[in-house]
């Protein structure tokens, strides 16, 4: 039995390309996180946090000085993440539909921030202070995004996505409790975030030592 022609809509190449392109934002959201299945995405705060921090890292990676080969590596990774849904779905869309999920691209996408970080680490000292400021601004944003995601997932399992945000009597909870678990996660995440934030502060200026010999 053949599945050919099950999706006649996608026999039209132009329509298929447009539909895949229209799904690009959903693919990006899926890379950031879905809880359970595709009907339970992370809260907007988490998505915005990753957009801001990840986008800043990539833009800075493209902006700093680097060799043509290094810039090409970063650009090819970005093109691979964007182009994979098109290349892998267009030949079979009419038979199986559009089945791509953003998480399928994660093995490639994880290389984007890593390569960008390598390029930034090789940049001149002129951008060092800018990088430090981005890190110190980005860490609190990511902490908020992570805590929001954990809270959202806990709420889904305790009350459902339509349930109360801060109920003290959830339909289900872990042994440590719904809000207790969220609070503990927030505490640990904030502590780790503070350690990273504190480590990224500017190094103290070297003290001037006198070149004069000691009296006596």
Model region roles, listed by residue range:
Residues 1-14, 94-96, 152-160:
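Helix-to-loop transition at the C-terminal end of transmembrane segments
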Residues 1-65, 120, 166-186:
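Membrane-lumen/periplasm interface segments of multi-pass, membrane-embedded glycan/lipid transferases
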Residues 57-69, 116-125, 194-201:
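Structural signal for the C-terminal ends of transmembrane alpha-helices
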Residues 59-79, 131-133, 203:
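Membrane-interface helix-loop-helix junctions at transmembrane boundaries of multi-pass membrane enzymes
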Residues 69-92, 141-148, 211-215:
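Transmembrane alpha-helix segments characteristic
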Residues 90-100, 160-169:
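Membrane-interface interhelical loops and short amphipathic "cap" helices
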Residues 97-117:
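Hydrophobic/aromatic-rich transmembrane helices and adjacent perimembrane loops
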Residues 131-216:
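Transmembrane helical bundles and short interhelical boundary loops of multi-pass, membrane-embedded
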């Amino acid at each position: 039995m053949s599945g050919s022609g099950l999706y006649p809509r996608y026999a039209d190449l132009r329509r298929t390309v447009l539909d895949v392109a229209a799904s690009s934002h959903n693919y990006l959201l899926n890379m950031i996180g879905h809880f359970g299945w595709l009907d339970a995405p992370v809260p907007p705060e988490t998505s915005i946090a990753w957009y801001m921090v990840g986008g800043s890292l990539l833009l800075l990676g493209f902006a700093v000085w680097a060799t043509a080969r290094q810039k090409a590596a970063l650009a090819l990774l970005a093109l691979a993440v964007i182009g994979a849904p098109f290349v892998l779905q267009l030949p079979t869309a009419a038979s199986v539909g559009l089945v791509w999920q953003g998480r399928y691209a994660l093995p490639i996408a994880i290389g984007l921030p890593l390569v960008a970080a390598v390029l930034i680490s090789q940049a001149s000292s002129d951008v060092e202070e800018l990088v430090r400021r981005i890190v110190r601004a980005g860490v609190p944003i990511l902490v908020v995004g992570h805590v929001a995601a954990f809270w959202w997932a806990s709420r889904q399992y305790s009350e459902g996505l339509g349930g109360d945000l801060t109920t003290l009597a959830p339909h289900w909870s872990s042994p440590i409790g719904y809000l207790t678990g969220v609070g503990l996660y927030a505490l640990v995440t904030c502590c780790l975030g503070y350690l990273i934030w504190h480590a990224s502060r500017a190094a103290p200026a070297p003290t001037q030592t006198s070149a004069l010999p000691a009296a006596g």
